[in-house]
Structures are given as C-alpha cells and as structure tokens.
Swiss-Prot record:
It comes from Dictyostelium discoideum. Component of the Golgi-associated retrograde protein (GARP) complex. This is Vacuolar protein sorting-associated protein 51 homolog. One of its GO terms (biological process) is retrograde transport, endosome to Golgi. Keywords: Coiled coil. Belongs to the VPS51 family. Residues 229-259, 524-547 form a coiled coil. The gene is vps51.
C-alpha cells in the first residue's frame, strides 16, 4: 500500500494533515530537515525523506481505520442497548418503564458517556424520548404536571442535567430559573405577575404556548422517525437471517471455483513464464530508453523554453530530471548533459535577475521572475532583496515623475497621485506576501518569516514616507486652507481602503496626524520666515534710504508698516488654522481635534518665545559677535525697539483678541471638551518691553561709541599728538561742535520714533541718578590714583582697554534707558563722557593742554544745558576736568573769568552764524 502513493501525493498529504514544522516532523518520523525541505520543494532524491513521509501516511491511515472500527463497535453496543432484549422489544420503539427506572437509566447514560453526550445517535434519543414520554404520561395521570414541565423533563432526560454553557450552580439552584431543577412554579408565577404588565403577561403566555406546540411537534416527529428506522432495522435483520441460511452452500461452491481458477492460473504462468520475463525486460528497456531520450533532449528543451521565455516549464523539466542526472553523474554522458543543463539554467537565472531588476518589467513578470527563482532554490535573501529593490526603484521612479508634474488644482493632483501610487503600492504588498511570507507555511524558519516581515515594513515605510513627502510638498505650495483640507480628506479616504496592507507599519491615524501636524508646522514656520523677511526688508530700506527716511514721518511710517505687516501675518495664521475646526468641512478630523488644538497652542507659545526672546535678540548677537555687524545700523535697532513698543501697546492686545476668537471657533467645532492653555498677556507685554529695552540699550551703546570716537579723534588731532607743548588756548576746539552736532542728529532720529518729554518737566530723578553716577566715578577716580600704572605705560594701557571700555561702562555705570527721547540721549551722552574720561587718563598734559581741555569742557557744559535745560552732566564734566588736572605735569588752573569769556564768545559767534543761516 505504501508503494502505490506518488511523491507528489506524499507532499500534498503532508501539507494537508501535518500542522507542525519540518523539525518536529523529522524528530517524530526520522529523516533530515534539509532533505525534507528539498523533497517538499520538488527535489525527490532524499530516500530518508520519502520513507519518513510514507511512515506518516501509513500511521495516519491506520489511526483513521482504528477510529472507524471503534465507532462501529460503539454503534453496535448502542443498537443492542436500545433494541436488544426479548421479542417484545421488536414490536415497538417505546420502552415503558417506571419513573424510577427512567431516572436511573438517564443518570447511568450520562455518567458513562458524559464526554460525548452532545453527539448521541437517534436510537438513544428515541430511548430517552420513550422514557420521558412514559414518565410524563404516568405523572400527568396521577399528579397533573403542566405541559412545560413535561417538555423540560424530556430534554433533560436526553441531554442530562447540568450540561451546557449556562449550567452553573447559582443559576441551577435558582427557583425562578424555568430550566433549572429547583424551579418553583408558584414563586415564578408570583414574580412574573408582580414584575410584568398585562400586555407582557399575555405576550409571555402566547410565547410559552407556541414553544410547547413546537416542542410537542418536534417530539412526535422524532418518535416517528425512530420508529421508522426501527422497522427498517428489523427488516434488515430478517433478510440477513434468510441469506445466512444459504451462505454455506455458496461458500463451498466459491471455494471449488477458486481452486479451479488457481489451477488454470498456474498452468498459464508455467506456460508463459519465459515470455513474460522477456516482455517485462523489454518493457523496462523501453521505459528506460524513453527516459534516456528525454534526458538527451533536455538541453534543447531547456533552450527552447528559454527562447520562448517559458521559464516555469523549464524549471519543471529541470527539477524533475535533476535527481537522475545527479545520481548518474559519474557517467561521462550524463555528466555532460548535467553540465549543459546547469549552464542553461545559470543563463536563465541571470536573465531572471536582469528582468527582475529592470524598470520596464511589468508587475506580473516581476512576480513570475521571483517565483521561478524561488523554485530554482535560489537564496531567499537574495531573491527577496532583489525583488524589493526592483519594486522600490520602480515605485520611486513613478513618484518622481508625478512629483515633476505641474499642479493647477491640489485636489486633482492628489487624486492622480493616489490612483497611481496606491494601486502600485497595494500590488507590491500583496505579491510580496504571497512570495515570501505565505509561501513559508511549510518551513520551520520562523526567523526567515520575521526577517521578511521586517524588510516589508521598511520597504513600505520608505515608499509611504516618499508619497507623504510629495503630498506635503505639493500641499505647501497652496495657500488656500480649505483646498488643503479637501486634499487631506481625499488622502484619508483613499488610504483607509488599504487598511489591511497598512496594518503592519502605518496606521491611518498616524498619517492624518502627521500630515495635519506638519501642515500646522508649515504655517508657523512660514510665519517666522515671513517675519524675518519683513525685518530684513526693513534693514535694507534703512541702508538704501539713509537720508530719505529722516524726512517727515518716513521713519515712523516704516516702523508702523513693519509692525502691522507682522500683525497681519499673525491674523493670516489664525485664518489658516480655523478650517481644522469647522465641522461642515472637516468631518474626518473630528477625532483628531484635541491633539490638533494642543499642537496649535504649543506652537503659539513657541512662536511668541521666538518673536520676543529669540528673533529680535539674535540681531544683538550678530552685532556683538559676527563680522556682519556693519549691515545692521544703530538706526535699525532704534526701529526694532519701536516695533517692540508697538507690540506692547497695541499688538499683544490684538493677538489676544484673535486668539480668543480662534478658541471660540475651536470649541464650537470640537466634539469634546478642549484643554485650553492659559495665556498671560501682561507677562508677554512685559517680555516684549524687556526685549525692546535690551535693543534700546545696545542702540545707546553703539551711538555713544560714535560720540566717543569724535572726542578721541579730537585728542589725537593736535600737532604730533603732544599735549605737553601745546600753545596757549584762545578758542574752543571745533571737535566740540562736531560732537554737539552728532547729538542733535541722534535727537532728531530718536524723536521720530520715541516719545519726547519736555525738558523743563524732566524730574529730579535724573539729577539723583547723575549724582550716584558721579559718586561711582569718583570712587573709580580715587582708585586710579593708587599705583600709577597709567602714567608709566599709557600706550599699553590704551591698547588693552579701548575695545571693552564702552561695554564695561554701560553695564556698570549707566542706568538702563526708557522708551523716550530724553532718556536715550542722556544715556548716550553720559556713556560718551565716561569713555572720554577714561581716554583722558591715558594722556599727559602740559599747562596749556590742561587749559584747552578746561575750556572745551566748560563749553560742553553750557551747550548741553541749553539742549536739555538741566545740569545732568555737570558731575561727569567735572570728573573729566579733575582727570586732566591729575594728568597735568604743572597744573595751574585757568581763571574762570577767562574760561567763561572764551566760551561766551564762542556761543555768541555760534548763535550769530545760526541766525544768519
């Protein structure tokens, strides 16, 4: 029997009936795992694998036969227990017993066959039915049990008590459980009357009557069917008895005829034995020569298949004969055939790999190539990688061609993109699973399957990310948020149809979330980019129109235009964000609105942090640390500080109003409560003001450096830079006029952007600040009198301190400025005078030089008093005069009357010139 089954049937029988892997099979039935795997893939050379499969086949059939015989014996016992006994039992299928015997019989049946009680034969059901019927009839005549009790006893007699899903102890002992053994009619009746209305009671009555009638009909039908089968069984038994009577004579006749046939067969065999052996020999030779003929023609057949691209047929030819060729490879002719076939198959493999990698190969041809290579037992890793590489390259080329197309309407483009990519993507996933995952059902390589799944996941993610990047890049080129939402909805609906293919690596939720979040990031990134462009455009305008912007209100208009442009960009941002929460247009986003809203709030906070603490202040870092500081003038910083002042007074209020409107729209469109972050407008105004003041401080420091350069240049402008041999002074040096003119320019510039405070209303607070500043300078002055290092090496001291003088003085000695013209100008002048004082410490003066500086300082004192109407700078000017006196080799102060006369003459001359002009 085992010799009659073919190898192909053995393989099919293995896959159909064996549920474990080849390793478990070899441990149970013997053989080698590699040999078994090759045998299962079509290489039938392994005798051990064939013997193991036949052993499995024989054992399986033997078990089935034993189970069948055991079932026949059980049926016979059941038949005897049901219909056996005396002759009286042959007349009727109804077994009349007493109630006690019926109950006992039912219990015994349940105990002995409890494990198969749900699969009883109809004969046992007939017995149970007859027992229950007789019991019910007897009880009804004596005690008058209701019909429902009779039906319940009938079913319980057949199935046995306590069998079923709902047979737990609590429900079985419930007196209100109509199917339980503890059922109490009176309690059930009282309970249902109390808990039900009249209509419900009538409905319950009709239901129970219908169930009773149905069960009665089923029981009668069951009894009739079993009675019919019983009659048929008795007829069969009678026929069997009749036929058995003549069986002995028939067997004797059959034995006689068999002996005659045996004698004739022996005579024929003895007569034809010689010829039969010859015929068998010739028949075997014919079959052998036919095989040899096919083997000799195998190379030409393979070449023909290769030319016709019938690769599957070539693989079948090769695999079916490779075993014979290997078996007789020691014979030269067979060795030549095998070498030629191997060469042809190698050529075919190369062509298959080439076709697999070609972009022009169709989807079906690509799958066929991979399948044929797998049938040729090529390494799975190599075929898998080549297949994925080919399909990935083909799909990416498709996406790149779509990416290059111009887009007029984003919705139409997304539809075309989905139609091309998603169909290709779905086919790739399905074909890959059929080739490398589902194909591995018969192998024991769980690691191989896992590796295939991981590579499929990477393949899918790469392609899907490329697809999403193209969609996002195209979406970013459109400004209409409504059209973007429609495009996202198309992506959502189309990708949702591929849920099964995406389940292993990408969820539709992640796709929508990432797309929407990226779109939100784009809005905010674009806002930051636009603000940077506004600021750079502002700086370019200031550099190109240096003089024009100072005419009229051009500077203020430029500042206001930049501020309003930034606010308009913020307004546009909220307009772009609102469609995400409009329920009539974004139904598919309803489940994502809470995360979208949280994302927007976080991005808003990051934006204000960027605007206040990062973007505006980064220009200060550029000016302080990079070589590009020259492209940002002090005027640019002044305008930037005025923009901060605008945001503090108006911009923040408008932004808060826009945010409140946006939150209202979001709450109306959301299906559940949104978590709204607290927005501290006063704190934001404070931060904006602090940023503006920092910028204004840097502007003040840069402006003071210009004044400081003028004063330092005046110190270096004397002949030979020698203050010891200077001629007797007779006038104020011209550098002081240049210094005052530069101050007037700063005043004109700052007054166009910052509020102007009346000089006469300048509070005493400025004088107190000046006094404190004077004290600090005096302390520094006294400390400079200690080791006289400046006197010994003034040039070295100058080179080491000139770069950081203004910064150090500004940080330690000058109060922070405020948003008004007077505060800024006072800070600029004070810082320049402090720096000038430090420069005086590095010089050595003669008597005339000391007198010249004394005259210059007195002239500045008078001029600054005329400008500001206060004595804010007297202490600083006095400190400068004290420094010159200390640095003079022969300090003889010039008479105050002479100083006053020279300065008054200069002042009058200056006023006359101004009046004439």
């Amino acid at each position: 029997m085992s010799q009659s089954i073919s190898d192909i049937k053995l393989v099919k029988f293995y896959y159909r009936h064996y549920k474990l892997g080849p390793q478990d099979f070899c441990r149970e039935y013997g053989g080698n795992v590699d040999g078994l795997n090759k045998f299962l893939t079509g290489n039938y050379d392994s005798l051990a694998a064939r013997d193991a499969l036949r052993s499995f086949w024989e054992r399986f059939n033997t078990n089935q036969l034993m189970k069948s015989q055991a079932g026949d014996e059980d049926d016979g016992d059941e038949f005897n227990s049901t219909f056996g006994g005396g002759d009286s039992m042959l007349l009727s299928p109804i077994k009349v017993t007493s109630p006690m015997s019926s109950s006992s019989s039912s219990t015994n049946t349940t105990n002995s066959n409890g494990q198969i009680i749900g699969n009883r034969s109809f004969s046992s059901l007939a017995e149970a039915t007859s027992n229950a019927t007789t019991t019910t009839t007897s009880t009804t005549t004596t005690g008058g049990k209701p019909e429902s009790k009779r039906v319940r006893n009938l079913l319980k007699t057949y199935y046995g008590p306590g069998i079923g899903e709902g047979s737990d102890s609590s429900s079985m002992n419930d007196p209100l459980n109509i199917d339980g053994p503890s059922f109490n009619l009176n309690s059930y009746f009282d309970s249902i009357v109390k808990s039900s209305t009249l209509n419900q009671l009538i409905q319950k009555d009709n239901q129970m009557v219908s169930e009773i009638r149905t069960l009665d009909g089923d029981m009668k039908t069951l009894v009739y069917d079993n009675y019919t089968k019983f009659i048929n069984a008795t007829d069969i038994i009678k026929k069997m008895k009749t036929n058995v009577e003549n069986m002995e004579e028939g067997m004797a006749l059959l034995s006689k005829n068999m002996d005659l046939i045996t004698n004739c067969s022996e005579k024929i065999n003895s007569t034809l034995s010689v010829r039969r052996d010859r015929i068998d020999q010739l028949s075997g030779l014919q079959k052998f020569f036919q095989k040899l003929q096919f083997l000799t023609a195998l190379p030409s057949s393979l070449n023909h298949c290769l030319a016709m691209q019938a690769y599957n047929q070539a693989v079948r030819y090769y695999n079916s004969n490779s075993g014979i060729l290997k078996q007789y490879s020691h014979i030269p002719s067979f060795q030549n055939i095998q070498n030629e076939c191997d060469s042809i198959m190698k050529t075919m493999k190369d062509k298959l790999y080439e076709r697999l990698s070609s972009l022009s190969t169709s989807q079906t041809d690509c799958v066929e190539s991979a399948e044929v290579l797998m049938d040729l037992l090529e390494p799975v890793e190599l075929v898998r990688s080549k297949y994925l590489e080919s399909r990935k390259h083909h799909t990416i080329t498709l996406l790149e061609n779509l990416e290059k197309k111009s887009v007029e309407h984003i919705t139409d483009y997304i539809k075309e993109l989905n139609a091309n990519f998603l169909s290709e993507y779905s086919y790739n996933i399905t074909s890959y699973k059929s080739l490398f995952i589902n194909r591995l059902d018969g192998s024991d390589s769980k690691k191989e399957r896992q590796q295939s799944l991981l590579q499929l996941e990477d393949f899918s993610k790469d392609l899907f990310n490329k697809y999403l990047n193209i969609a996002k890049s195209k979406l970013s080129s459109f400004k209409d948020p409504i059209e973007k939402i429609m495009a996202l909805e198309i992506i959502n609906s189309d990708v949702s149809r591929l849920g099964s293919e995406l389940s292993s690596h990408e969820k539709i939720t992640n796709i929508i979330n990432s797309t929407v979040h990226d779109q939100i990031d784009f809005y905010f990134d674009n806002l930051q980019k636009t603000i940077k462009e506004h600021i750079h455009q502002l700086n370019s305008t200031l550099n190109e129109r240096r003089d024009e912007v100072l005419e009229g209100h051009n500077l203020q208009e430029l500042s206001d235009a930049t501020s309003k442009a930034i606010v308009n960009d913020i307004i546009l941002l909220f307009a772009n964000l609102k469609p995400f929460f409009l329920p009539t247009e974004t139904q598919f986003l309803s489940s994502y609105q809470d995360t979208i809203f949280t994302k927007i709030q976080v991005k808003l906070q990051q934006f204000f942090l960027f605007l206040v603490n990062i973007h505006f202040l980064e220009y200060l870092d550029i000016i302080a640390t990079t070589s590009n500081r020259e492209q940002f003038s002090g005027r640019f910083l002044l305008v930037l500080s005025s923009i901060c002042l605008y945001f503090e007074n108006k911009g923040i209020t408008l932004v808060v109003q826009l945010m409140s409107e946006f939150i209202t729209v979001a709450k109306q469109g959301a299906k559940k409560e949104l978590n709204v972050f607290s927005f501290n407008a006063p704190d934001l105004c404070k931060r904006v003001r602090e940023t503006g003041l920092q910028i204004l401080n840097v502007f003040t420091r840069l402006s003071s450096q210009k004044l400081d350069k003028i004063l330092k240049k005046g110190l270096e402008s004397i002949p030979n830079n020698n203050w010891l041999v200077l001629k007797e002074p007779r006038d104020v040096r011209s550098v002081n006029d240049i210094y005052l003119e530069e101050i007037l320019k700063f005043q004109n510039e700052t007054s166009k952007l910052l509020p102007v405070i009346n000089h006469h209303h300048h509070s005493l607070k400025s004088h107190s600040r000046t006094g404190s500043g004077g004290n600090s300078v005096s302390s520094n002055n006294s400390s400079s009198n200690t080791p006289d290092g400046h006197r010994r090496n003034p040039s070295a001291s100058s080179s080491s301190s000139s770069n950081n003088t203004n910064t150090t003085l500004f940080e330690k000695k000058v109060d922070h400025v405020d948003f008004n013209t007077l505060s800024v100008l006072i800070a600029i002048i004070k810082l320049s005078l402090k720096s000038f004082n430090e420069s005086l410490r590095l010089k050595t003066f003669g008597t005339n030089g000391c007198h010249q500086i004394q005259i210059d300082l007195h002239y500045l004192k008078l001029s600054l008093y005329d400008l500001f109407g206060s004595n804010s700078f007297d202490n600083l000017l006095q400190e400068c005069e004290n420094t010159v006196t200390e640095r003079c080799v022969d300090p003889l102060p010039l008479a105050k009357s002479i100083v006053s006369k020279i300065c008054e003459t200069k002042m009058n001359k200056k006023k006359n010139n101004e009046a004439e002009s």
